[in-house]
């Protein structure tokens, strides 16, 4: 690529100019925001709740801590963290998509979760928070939609306190060939049809399936976290590696 030419990236399987991907991803989540929680339950058969519960357990949030739930969407993790950090703590639900934030804010307020939660529309690649600010950062099913994942990881490392931890919960690469074949069939044949039926939007769920395949595998993401400055990076596979939880610390 010669100097001055636009940089390209992937949007699912499509190649697009890097500076246009965020808008394309935004369109997807504007479209699915209202039915996002329903689709999570349907397309994962409810298993996403187990994945998130395990993430909360590994996070080990305590009273008084500051937690950033990045790409927090409709607030599943934020709701749990709010109870754990208590009145002396703080949870920031941050998402680049205002439609998702609105759904999350309404959902949490309907549950009476108001006192220790704030909402910020933010780009993960340039987080608008001070250095060394959060004890815990989580990003669940969001990193694969970020244009510059390396920049986002560096930004998270910057705003994390020394001694703090980052948890990345994301779809990944199944360990066994049979699971990979079943998963591919489900993702590309069944998932878009579910999206069409429930949200009237098959294309968005086709993108989501493609974005999973384009996301770095477990070992690649582990190295990306190390390169961003995280230490003691490890990961746990769940559901045969359909999902992986990566953990890294800042010292």
Curated annotation (Swiss-Prot):
GO terms for molecular function: 2-methoxy-6-polyprenyl-1,4-benzoquinol methyltransferase activity; demethylmenaquinone methyltransferase activity. Its EC number is 2.1.1.163, 2.1.1.201. Keywords: Menaquinone biosynthesis, Methyltransferase, S-adenosyl-L-methionine, Transferase, Ubiquinone biosynthesis. Pathway: Quinol/quinone metabolism; menaquinone biosynthesis; menaquinol from 1,4-dihydroxy-2-naphthoate: step 2/2; Cofactor biosynthesis; ubiquinone biosynthesis. HAMAP family: MenG_UbiE_methyltr. S-adenosyl-L-methionine binds at residues 74, 95, 123-124. This is Ubiquinone/menaquinone biosynthesis C-methyltransferase UbiE. InterPro entries: SAM-dependent_MTases_sf, UbiE/COQ5_MeTrFase, UbiE/COQ5_MeTrFase_CS. PROSITE patterns: SAM_MT_UBIE (PS51608), UBIE_1 (PS01183), UBIE_2 (PS01184). It holds the Pfam family Ubie_methyltran. The gene is ubiE. It catalyses: a 2-demethylmenaquinol + S-adenosyl-L-methionine = a menaquinol + S-adenosyl-L-homocysteine + H(+); a 2-methoxy-6-(all-trans-polyprenyl)benzene-1,4-diol + S-adenosyl-L-methionine = a 5-methoxy-2-methyl-3-(all-trans-polyprenyl)benzene-1,4-diol + S-adenosyl-L-homocysteine + H(+).
């Amino acid at each position: 690529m010669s100097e001055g030419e636009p940089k390209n990236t992937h949007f699912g399987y499509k190649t697009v100019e890097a500076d246009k991907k965020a808008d394309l991803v935004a369109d997807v989540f504007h479209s699915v925001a209202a039915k996002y929680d329903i689709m999570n339950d349907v397309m994962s058969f409810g298993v996403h709740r187990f994945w998130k519960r395990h993430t909360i357990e590994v996070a080990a949030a305590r009273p008084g801590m500051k937690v950033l739930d990045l790409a927090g969407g409709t607030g599943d993790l934020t709701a749990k963290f709010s109870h754990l950090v208590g009145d002396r703590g703080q949870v920031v639900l941050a998402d680049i998509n205002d439609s998702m934030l609105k759904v999350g804010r309404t959902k949490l307020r309907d549950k009476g979760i108001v006192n220790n939660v704030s909402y910020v529309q933010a780009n993960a690649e340039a987080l608008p928070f001070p250095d060394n600010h959060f004890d815990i950062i989580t990003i669940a099913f969001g990193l694969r939609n970020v244009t510059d994942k390396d920049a986002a990881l560096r930004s998270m490392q910057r705003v994390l306190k020394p001694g703090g931890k980052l948890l990345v919960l994301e779809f990944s690469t199944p360990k066994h060939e049979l699971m990979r074949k079943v998963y591919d069939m489900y993702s590309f044949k069944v998932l878009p049809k579910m999206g069409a039926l429930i949200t009237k939007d098959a294309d968005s769920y086709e993108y989501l399936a493609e974005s999973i395949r384009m996301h770095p595998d477990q070992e690649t993401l582990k190295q990306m976290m190390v390169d961003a400055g995280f230490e003691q990076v490890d990961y746990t596979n769940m559901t045969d590696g359909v999902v992986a939880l990566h953990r890294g610390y800042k010292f």
